[in-house]
Regions:
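N-terminal active-site segment of His-dependent metallophosphoesterases
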Residues: 8-115
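Acidic, His/Gly-rich catalytic cores of divalent-metal-dependent hydrolytic chemistry
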Residues: 353-358, 365-389
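Solvent-exposed loop/turn segments at secondary-structure junctions
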Residues: 65-68, 105-108, 139-144, 200-205, ...
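Extended active-site neighborhood of metal-dependent phosphoesterases/phosphodiesterases
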Residues: 35, 39-45, 110-229, 268, ...
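Structured segments of extracytoplasmic/periplasmic soluble domains
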Residues: 65-68, 86-91, 108, 125, ...
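Loop/turn elements at helix/coil->beta-strand transitions in domains of secreted/extracellular proteins
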Residues: 55-58, 94-99, 128-134, 191-194, ...
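Active-site neighborhood of phospho(di)ester-bond hydrolases with catalytic His/Asp-centered motifs
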Residues: 61-63, 99-104, 133-139, 243-247, ...
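Active-site-proximal segments of metal-dependent phosphoesterases and phosphodiesterases across multiple
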Residues: 205-227, 235-306
Length: 389
């Protein structure tokens, strides 16, 4: 209780600050814990390193850190920010190709000044790392959880807050590409491998009397412009092994959309790409999420999308739909088993603060020569799983 009160005092923002200066000072005191970095480094040295070659792509991946201005010993809190520091510390030491965060950097339940400060801190840590990085937007990253708990429910984040703090910096790196300055689709190339990042929180920011038409935390989707951009990128993807990444799962094991809008259309587009088809992608909607576009994947050579990797669900799962592997990774954020919102998957891990089970993260190694994607988990994560690509 004393720890919580100290943290609360230090993290209380001054009125009208865009980013809380006190939050920034507090976060900059956080350091990687040697027992954690030694453990993660051991996972890399013993399990991952033997698979690394000049042709492979090796990534450090975190998802759902849910950083929050609270020094909690059993649930979401500052631990999420520290997990980023520790993962990037090891990445620097072993010279990985790419650091990826699959979204929900923050819990989005703090005052806006604090949430913006947490986002800024995380981005700055990724920027200081040696490897390039990509941070995807999660459904908590627009601070709508905070808005839900307020009586008037007005939007605490402005339209461009997240983009100005996070998204724009992804694309200031020469290794990260997009079609144009407003596209929500990014990609990274290394030799025969292409990793494409899509935004599953592609929701229009529309205000009505100060409140949002769509709650970003509750609504997930992909709009027509993003699908057009993805189509254009895929049409120019020739002789590549393609891995897709997003925050939320796009489709269920039964083939139904797992997004509120157009997850099934993303899947249909990927299947058409693998089949080298030409045709039309269309839904029955109008307005914000209506889609009607054409594609031609007949000239993409032997390119194939084999895998879609995401977080969001706070558990692990993998399944195949139309020959595409869909892989869900566990949340980095601490979820103690006594909390009501803790998933059954994390209850089984009995995750505890200041123990290895506190964290959950992954190394992913993609090998175009062995046609294999390997995932090496650490902390509250499956130690090893392999997929054909």
């Amino acid at each position: 209780l004393k720890i919580k009160n100290i943290a609360r005092k230090m993290l209380t923002p001054k009125p009208s600050e865009f980013v809380s200066a006190q939050t920034d000072i507090f976060l900059k005191r956080l350091k990687p814990r040697p027992f954690v970095t030694d453990y993660i480094r051991g996972v890399y040295d013993n399990n991952v390193k033997p698979n690394v070659t000049d042709d492979t792509v090796t990534l450090s991946v975190l998802t759902d850190t849910h950083a929050k201005a609270l020094a909690s010993a059993s649930y979401y809190g500052i631990n999420g920010a520290r997990h980023i520091i520790e993962a990037n510390n090891v990445s620097d030491a072993v010279h990985l190709d790419l650091n990826v965060h699959l979204g929900d950097l923050i819990d989005g339940s703090d005052k806006p000044e604090i949430s913006r400060g947490l986002l800024q801190f995380a981005v700055e840590n990724y920027q200081r790392s040696k490897a390039p990085y990509y941070i995807l937007e999660g459904n908590h990253d627009e601070n709508d959880k905070y808005d839900e708990h307020r009586f008037f429910g007005s939007a605490s984040f402005h339209r461009d807050d997240y983009d100005s703090l996070v998204t724009k910096y992804n694309f200031e790196q020469p290794e990260i590409h997009r079609l144009n300055p407003v596209s929500k689709v990014g990609w990274y190339d290394k030799k025969d491998i292409r990793i494409i990042f899509i935004d599953t929180s592609d929701i229009p920011y529309i205000l009505s009397n100060g409140s949002k038409k769509y709650d970003f935390k509750k609504v997930r989707g992909v709009r027509e412009q993003q699908l057009e951009d993805l189509t254009a990128i895929l049409e120019k993807t020739i002789d590549k092994h393609v891995v897709m990444m997003g925050h939320a799962n796009i489709i269920s094991p039964s083939g139904r959309s797992a997004l509120n809008f157009n997850g099934d259309l993303v899947q249909r587009l990927l299947v058409a790409f693998n089949n080298k088809d030409s045709g039309q992608l269309k839904n029955e909607l109008t307005g914000d999420f209506g889609v009607n576009l054409r594609y031609d994947f007949s000239s993409t050579g032997i390119s194939k999308v084999t895998t879609y990797i995401c977080g969001h669900m706070h558990y692990e799962k993998n399944y195949k739909v139309s020959e595409i592997n869909h892989i869900i990774l566990n949340c980095s954020a601490l979820m103690g088993k006594k909390h009501g919102l803790t998933t059954d998957y994390n209850k089984k891990w009995d995750r505890r603060y200041n123990e290895i089970s506190e964290l959950a993260g992954y190394f992913i190694n993609i090998d175009p020569n062995k046609l294999r994607l390997q995932i090496f988990g650490y902390g509250a994560a499956t130690r090893y799983v392999s997929f054909e690509i």
